[in-house]
Amino acid sequence: MKILSLRLKNLNSLKGEWKIDFTREPFASNGLFAITGPTGAGKTTLLDAICLALYHETPRLSNVSQSQNDLMTRDTAECLAEVEFEVKGEAYRAFWSQNRARNQPDGNLQVPRVELARCADGKILADKVKDKLELTATLTGLDYGRFTRSMLLSQGQFAAFLNAKPKERAELLEELTGTEIYGQISAMVFEQHKSARTELEKLQAQASGVTLLTPEQVQSLTASLQVLTDEEKQLITAQQQEQQSLNWLTRQDELQQEASRRQQALQQALAEEEKAQPQLAALSLAQPARNLRPHWERIAEHSAALAHIRQQIEEVNTRLQSTMALRASIRHHAAKQSAELQQQQQSLNTWLQEHDRFRQWNNEPAGWRAQFSQQTSDREHLRQWQQQLTHAEQKLNALAAITLTLTADEVATALAQHAEQRPLRQHLVALHGQIVPQQKRLAQLQVAIQNVTQEQTQRNAALNEMRQRYKEKTQQLADVKTICEQEARIKTLEAQRAQLQAGQPCPLCGSTSHPAVEAYQALEPGVNQSRLLALENEVKKLGEEGATLRGQLDAITKQLQRDENEAQSLRQDEQALTQQWQAVTASLNITLQPLDDIQPWLDAQDEHERQLRLLSQRHELQGQIAAHNQQIIQYQQQIEQRQQLLLTTLTGYALTLPQEDEEESWLATRQQEAQSWQQRQNELTALQNRIQQLTPILETLPQSDELPHCEETVVLENWRQVHEQCLALHSQQQTLQQQDVLAAQSLQKAQAQFDTALQASVFDDQQAFLAALMDEQTLTQLEQLKQNLENQRRQAQTLVTQTAETLAQHQQHRPDDGLALTVTVEQIQQELAQTHQKLRENTTSQGEIRQQLKQDADNRQQQQTLMQQIAQMTQQVEDWGYLNSLIGSKEGDKFRKFAQGLTLDNLVHLANQQLTRLHGRYLLQRKASEALEVEVVDTWQADAVRDTRTLSGGESFLVSLALALALSDLVSHKTRIDSLFLDEGFGTLDSETLDTALDALDALNASGKTIGVISHVEAMKERIPVQIKVKKINGLGYSKLESTFAVK
């Protein structure tokens, strides 16, 4: 994984938006750069931004959400962090941002917005928090914990690891490398073994508690069940006969009751028909009157229509008179306003003619303002250039004397050559510090390989002997365990053996002979159980010792392989480094050898470069002084020319040039005069528009309308609507008068038609017709009543006949079971209830017997199943017991410590590789007496072994940095790490130790990694030319980067 660029906005003290592109110069050609600035300026904020963009949290602040954000710069409303990174040649962009409501600093925090996109095509791969975190971890192979331990390194943390106690070091190893799974496995094996033993004891207790029926009990219950079954069949037959008789009698009673009800219904229907005769008589006259109803209703409709039309005529006349009066008022007011407006128009025309000169400079103030502003700006620039000229002359006079006499071009060429050779010089220093330590380390490895090979042979012999002993003891344990299990199984059947009687069959095997009962009762399981416990302890101890020995042998084998690989790697590295040395010296055109002292040559190069830089500064200052003089002359000429041009322009308008610093008030006066003239012009245009609006009113509305006696306030804008309303009402008045004539004619015609129909009817006059006339609803009800009465009488008569026939047919089908003629329904129901009760008692007895038989069968099946489960569980207990003896423990310590030891061996091996690259003097190794203790080997002091607590600051830094890089490789074993950021406190190191640390960083840079170091130490600025400078802004509490990193 490689960080390509970083963009951030408003984070902590870094206010504003900034972007650092690590793919561009100067980062592209310099893999080592420093992040410098005073304490508290915000250097670590850059690393916080990287973590925030990728994982939404930082090492200093783990909670950034909608409810809390302490990262956002105060008095701002938004913040963001964006990182572009590369994994396996593919570039991705991780983005995080948050803003406040209404985009105001006091607004509530909103939900953060996140994105993970592919840079090649801009496709968004994830935009939800959980999805983005999971996809980032999948792509990079690093979650937040591994990222902050592999790409963001802090020396202080690993110094704590170096000097920690074994228990603390074990916890740190487990946290950093994820080996906690081994402790969980160890504890799980222990718990599984314990659980299996508990389950076996439960099964054995269940098997001893199962009770079975004797054969005699089973035979007796089976015979009783057969008797009850025969009795049940007889009761069911009797129940069916009794139910049949009860059904026949019940049906006969129902038919007799129904015949009585239907005879009563017939009598009631005849009575209701007799009662309705007066209403039916009125119906005979109402039906002829129905035929005349349409003629009568037509007369009523025409009379109502005529009355409605005449009412409308009256309403329209009233509205027409009112609207015409309103139209006359509107015309009167329009004429009056037109006269007043024309008088105002004449007054405005007079004022505009008198002040016409204001119009001439209506558009000039903007140009005058620009010229006045330019004059002020030029005067300020003139003063600045004069100050810069004085400052440059002072700097030139303060420069130290130099002996070089080169032109500016020659100086630039020489400095460029030094810049090109600087990486080569740094590379030469790194190579010089690597070749000699590698030669010494190679000799040490040869001796170490011989010693480890001899130790490997000895451990193999010891392991083979221990395996033979373990095999013998395991066989003895299996034999004793079989005996103990047999004794335990015999012991669990003690309750059943106590129930055995001579001559009685065994419930399990059926035998009537029990010869071994007394022998079983005389068993003493304690002796074999003691042997079993002793053998289990001995096998467990041999297993643990064998596992430890195997682990030691594996560690020795791996150490041997690592030493051989390291020796081969060192030989290849030595050859490669020698070739690089020759290439570098050839490029520098020097003849130095790897073992020569190169410091005098380096000092001479530095002094020559310093002289060149001083001479370059002198040439640069001389050029600045000439340029400043030219600028001063140019600005003086511009000020004089613009002053003359302004004076000429204002004279043409009869205006005088304002005094210096009074331009704004002078411009304000001119602007007010121009605005005053324009305001009067706008008022004149508005008056003319208003007069034009009144003209159509006066031309359209007639003068013949009579004015109302009392004038009212009118709205002139509605004049057209009022006029159109007058015309519409007049047209409506004429239409209604025509409708009135037609309605009167229709009424006369309807009256004549009714009179003719009345003469042809059964009625003598109109009064007789009205007396017989009924409303349609009443007439329909009477007709429906007559029809209902007739239908009700016929239906009742039919039902009486049908019921009599049904009763006669039922009596012909009397049951043939000897049913007496005098028996009642109650007697049959009583007999049927007795039969039901006997059946219930029979069924209950059968159920009890069947349940006893089923329970006995279930118990026998349960006992057989339990014996099978006991056998299976016994095997599981043995399997888990063996595994528990090897790696199991209650707290998970046994397997965890073994895994942590292997992890520490791997970490020490990787750290030694890093130490060889950084500085060939020191190596790390595990203490033989302590499981997780490490010590330092000083190869320059005859491989003297030292405790890590005795290291100096510089030595501790080198070892801690090697451990940090090794742990980075260990944590990120599936992901290549090409970028490292060291948040290290170099300020506590002395000058000599600081030089050692910087040499180590140079050597690390030569390995191809991009390294960023946070520091505020001045010596860092000289040794690391590429820097990201974080500067405080005095008095504001904010910081900033250089302008090249600002996003505009």
Curated annotation (Swiss-Prot):
Keywords from the named record: ATP-binding, Coiled coil, DNA recombination, DNA replication, Endonuclease, Exonuclease, Hydrolase, Nuclease, Nucleotide-binding
GO terms under biological process: DNA recombination; DNA repair; DNA replication; DNA replication termination; double-strand break repair
Record Gene3D superfamilies: P-loop containing nucleotide triphosphate hydrolases
InterPro entries hit by this protein: P-loop_NTPase, Rad50/SbcC_AAA, SbcC_gammaproteobac_type
Keyword ATP-binding part of the UniProt annotation: yes
Annotated Pfam families: AAA_23, SbcC_Walker_B
Listed GO CC annotations: DNA repair complex
Coiled coil: 191-402, 438-502, 528-648, 671-695, 770-880
Binding, ATP: G37, P38, T39, G40, A41, G42, K43, T44
GO MF annotation terms: 3'-5'-DNA exonuclease activity; ATP binding; ATP hydrolysis activity; DNA exonuclease activity; double-stranded DNA endonuclease activity; single-stranded DNA endodeoxyribonuclease activity
Assembly notes: Heterodimer of SbcC and SbcD.
NCBIfam families documented for this protein: PRK10246.1 (NF007600), sbcc (TIGR00618)
Name of the protein in its database record: Nuclease SbcCD subunit C
Provenance organism: Escherichia coli (strain K12)
Gene from which this protein is expressed: sbcC
